[in-house]
Amino acid sequence: MENGFLLINKEQGKTSFETLFPIKKYFNTNHVGHAGILDKFASGILIALVGKYTKLANYFMSLDKEYVAEFRFGLETDTLDPNGRIVNKTDYIPNLEDIDLKLKDFVGEIYQSPPRFSSVHINGSRAYKLALNGKFFEIKKRRVNVYDIQRLSYDFSSSLLSLKISCSKGTYIRSIARDLAYSLNSCAYVSSLKRTKVGIFRLEDSTLCKNLSKASLISLESLKSFEKVCIDSSKINLVKNGAYVEIQININEFKILKSREGEILAVIKGIDLNKYKYVIIF
C-alpha cells in the first residue's frame, strides 16, 4: 500500500469528500483522507493523506492557513456563501475608508461564532444538519488568530471586496465577512473563496486530481519541522514493535525515527517532556 500525502488543487463545486474519489481510485485504496475541509463553493489547496499518513490528519489540520476571499456587501445568505438563501438585504454599502478602519479590528486574537451552516458539533450533531432541519441553537464564540489581512481590491459599484487573509486553524472566513459587514452597519456573504496556503505548502505546488501521478505523492522527508532521529540498529526491532526507546522530545513535538541507512521507521509525538506516543509505525 502506498503511503504519503498529496497537495491537491480542489475545484470549485466539489466537496472535499468528493475530491478524494479519484485519489482512492488511482491508488486503489480506501485509506485516503483529507486534512481540513474546504467548502463546496471554495477552491484551492487541500491536503490529502494516503495510507498510514491518514494518522497525521490532526497535525496537518493544526497548520495555519491563507485564503483569498471575495465579500459581497448588501446581501446575506443563510449559509454566508453563494449557494444559500438570501435572508438579509440592505442598500447601504460601506465606503473604502470605513472598511480599512474596521479591518484592523479583525487582526490579532479575535472571538468569532462559526456559521450556522458549518461542521461544528452541537450536542453530538453537526450544526449544518440542525440548520437544515430548522432547529434553533446557539454556537459559542471561539478564539482564533488572524495574523494578517491585506485588501487586494474594492469595487464599490459591484460591492465586492477582495482580501488576502492569513489565519490560524478553525478560522471561518464566512464569519469574518458576516462580522465585518455588521460592524459597518451592512451585511455580506463570501462570494468566492480560495485557499492558497496550508503551513509551508502553497497552492502553486498543488495538482489537479486529473493530473495525479506517483510523483505527486510526498513523503515525510519534506516536513522540515519534524526532526529526524537516528535509531541504533540494536533498537530498530523495538521501534517496529512500538516499544519505548529513550528519546528527548517536548510535548506536542513530532519526530521521525530513522535507521542509519535512512529507512523511515516511525513517527512519534511528544505527550510530555521526554514521553511520547507512536503516531505511525512503518
From Swiss-Prot:
Catalytic activity as recorded in UniProt: uridine(55) in tRNA = pseudouridine(55) in tRNA
Residues at the catalytic site: D39
Specify the enzyme's EC class, one word. isomerase
Q: Which UniProt keywords apply?
A: Isomerase, tRNA processing
Which cysteine pairs are joined by S-S bonds? none
Q: Which GO terms describe its biological process?
A: mRNA pseudouridine synthesis; tRNA pseudouridine synthesis
Q: What is its EC number?
A: 5.4.99.25
GO molecular-function term, one example from the UniProt record? tRNA pseudouridine(55) synthase activity
User: What does this gene product do?
Assistant: Responsible for synthesis of pseudouridine from uracil-55 in the psi GC loop of transfer RNAs.
HAMAP family, alphabetized: TruB_bact
Family, similarity comment: Belongs to the pseudouridine synthase TruB family. Type 1 subfamily.
Q: What is this protein called?
A: tRNA pseudouridine synthase B
- Gene name as annotated: truB
